[in-house]
């Protein structure tokens, strides 16, 4: 059931954000990524050791860093980060021992992340959505020239 709720909630948020224009702002999905990554830090604060908190902060920092790079250069990096966080949700219990993470969380958050990533990638069909104004994506440069500029 957690998978279904994550999927439906992600689609609902995405469609609502598009419908009212929230995702026209380049910052929307990077902020979503940072907030999603912060939940494990919250769980660690609620009931885990300092060691777990530090591990969660490091992971959050990595995802937040990719989100910020995506905001600055190419939002497709944010879609990749969301998908990677979805995978991370499923391996998290094997990497970081945390007694405060609810049992249903990996299924819920993982499905939310993957659906949000897919939706953000789907939005890439809109020209100019993913690359910061005045920049060409390195992916586009590579496609045109076969080289990274």
Predicted regions located by residue number:
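N-terminal signal-anchor/start-transfer transmembrane helix
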Residues: 5-22
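Membrane-water interface at the C-terminal end of transmembrane alpha helices
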Residues: 13-17, 68-76, 103, 111-135
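Membrane-helix interface "capping/anchor" motifs
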Residues: 20-29, 68-80
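Cytoplasmic-side transmembrane-helix entry/capping segments in multi-pass membrane proteins
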Residues: 26-35, 54-59, 78-84
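Short, highly charged, low-complexity non-transmembrane loops/tails of multi-pass membrane proteins
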Residues: 129-149
């Amino acid at each position: 059931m957690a998978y279904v709720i994550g999927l439906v909630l992600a689609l609902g948020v995405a469609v609502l954000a598009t419908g009212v224009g929230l995702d026209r702002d380049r910052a929307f999905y990077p902020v979503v990524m940072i907030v999603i990554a912060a939940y494990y830090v919250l769980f660690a604060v609620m009931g885990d050791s300092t060691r777990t908190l530090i591990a969660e902060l490091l992971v959050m920092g990595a995802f937040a860093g990719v989100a910020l790079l995506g905001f600055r250069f190419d939002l497709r990096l944010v879609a990749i980060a969301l998908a990677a966080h979805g995978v991370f949700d499923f391996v998290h219990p094997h990497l970081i021992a945390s007694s405060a993470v609810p049992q249903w969380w990996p299924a819920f958050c993982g499905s939310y992340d993957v659906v949000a990533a897919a939706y953000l990638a789907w939005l890439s069909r809109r020209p100019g959505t993913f690359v910061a104004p005045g920049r060409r994506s390195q992916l586009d440069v590579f496609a045109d020239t076969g080289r990274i500029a």
